[in-house]
Amino acid sequence: MNTLTISHELSKIHQVDYDSALSELSVFFKDGRAYKYFKIEPRHFSMISKLVQERKSVGKYLTEHIFNKYDQEKL
């Protein structure tokens, strides 16, 4: 399991976990909501990791590439 903590104060996202064995991405929001997305390619987690390191918008990437595009489950 790979975990990224988002420390940017303007981000609504607190943490992103990626399980490469299951290809599952879990997104945890600062307001307590959490969702798991299925069949996520490793390239998406790599890009999210890069965005976190560069302090760029993870939320924008998730909105454009993950949310409403992959099967999900509310946690």
Describe each model-derived feature in a short phrase:
Residues 1-75:
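Acidic/histidine-enriched, beta-strand-rich ligand/metal-binding domains
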